[in-house]
Every structure is written in structure tokens, then in C-alpha cells.
Amino acid sequence: MIAEPPVIDTPCAGRRRASPVHELTSLLAHAANYDLWPHFGRALLRRLPFAKQQDRRHERQMRGRCDEAAIDTESALRRLGISGPVLHLCRRFPEIWAAGQRQVEKCPIPFQELGIAGAANVELLHYLCRHLRAHRVLETGVALGWSSLAILLAISEGSGARLHSVDLPYTRLRATRWVGIVVPPELKGLWTLHRMADREGLPRALADGPFDLCHYDSDKSAAGRLWAYPRMWEALRPGGFLISDDIGDNHAWRTFCAQVGREPVVVHSGLKLVGVLVKA
């Protein structure tokens, strides 16, 4: 049998910052929704000049430190115990992936332009879920649903498997119907989508633990991460994986790794950096 070609990291354009107009309309939309008032208050605090300057200073420092330790996706999978050929998911599931792309092409909402749809490392998520024979998985951040699809394809053969996803409603974009649009109907029976901010949605999702894998890709602030990481870590089973996107943004990932006394695997993912921790 001819070996399948290895994974090659997919380039991405990086995470764009939303324009001031989009940020303002987002805040106004959240203010008009009573259920989102707690998130609205936290978002206002993060937009204070001091908070922004502090995060940007930490981003420059942490990016350099994480870059030094980063490896490619295939090397990371090997280090985490996965052997054998690894394919891009668009090759492993060509029909499902193409169908998802067709759904994206119908979407009138400029997700990427607004900085809320940076692609997750779907190969990393998929193959780690398969390696764990994951039964319960938790993620924050959905957008169009590529990470959700990668996870659902990995757990779909397990009896009673479930993915819990937490994602803030995109009120300003009238985009509710497009969240998770790439997930096909036949996989939605394994999926629970909590349309809430992390601090309201995560406690609900965590009630279905323990989890085999937790993936964080939502609130990028240090405060938001340092609130969520310990709760996700506590909900992980021994041997489970905590994965976080964009770990070079600020000090939160390194701070948390030091708190739990674990050394992460750092992965290059296009222009982003992804961190993986294994729970002992």
C-alpha cells in the first residue's frame, strides 16, 4: 500500500482586527440584549486603553518565546504519541469538506474580515481526538464550524459521543444561522451548541464532563483565558489534552502552564501558535 502524504501546515492570513465601526456596532448590539449584559460589561473593560496596551506588550514578549519552541503539526502529533500517515482533512473527507466549502461560499457575512473566523488547526484536533478515542469533547469558539466538523468526524464512530461547543452570538452580524454552517445534518445529533459567552456557557457545558479533550478559541484577553483554562483543565480526565489557539497573544498560556507545572507542546499553525498540554 502506498503511504499517504504527510500533513503540510495550511497557511492562513492571520487574525485581522475588527474595524472600530464593527467593534462599536458589536458593543451596541450586545447592550441591547439583556442576556449579554455581563459579557457587554467585560468587553467594555477590555477596550480601555490601559488594558489594550498591556495585552499588546505581552503579545510581543510571548510571541518571541513561543516561536522558539514551536514545531510543525506533524512533529507535534508524533511527540504526542501518534504514528502512521496523516492527511489533510480535505483529502481524508473530500466530499464532506467540499460540501462545507460550498456552504461557506453562500454565506453573505464577512466573518474573516471581522477577525472572528481564524481557522483552527483542524488536523491537530481531529487526530488527537482519534488518538484518545474521545467520547466527550469541549470547545469554545465556533464561527463557521470547521473545528467542530473536524472533532465530530473524529468522534462519530463512538457510541454516545458528544461535542459541546460554546460560542457567543454574533448579534451585530445577524449571523446566527451561519454559525456552524459547515457541520452536516448527519453529525448534528452528536453536537450541543451553547450560544452564550464563555462565563455563562462554559459552566453549562462543563456539567457533562469529564472530557477527553478541551479546545479554547474564544475570548483572547488574558483575563478571559485565565478564567477559562483552570475550569477546562479541572474537567479533563487524566491523559486528556487542553489545546489553546493564539497562545502568543499574551502571557496567559505560559502563566497557566507554570501554575499546573506542565510543559506544553507549541505548534506552528499558519501564522498562529497553538499550545497543547497533556494532563497527568
What spans do the regions from the language model cover?
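N-terminal acidic, proline/glycine-rich, low-complexity intrinsically disordered segments
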Residues: 1-7
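General structural signal for secondary-structure boundaries
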Residues: 4, 37-39, 63-70, 79-83, ...
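N-terminal auxiliary segments of SAM/dcSAM-dependent transferases
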Residues: 8-90
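S-adenosylmethionine/decaboxylated-SAM
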Residues: 8-15, 20-27, 111-280
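Short charge-dense sequence patches
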Residues: 67-80, 94-105, 176-184, 203-208
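Class I SAM-dependent transferase core
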Residues: 79-121, 126-131
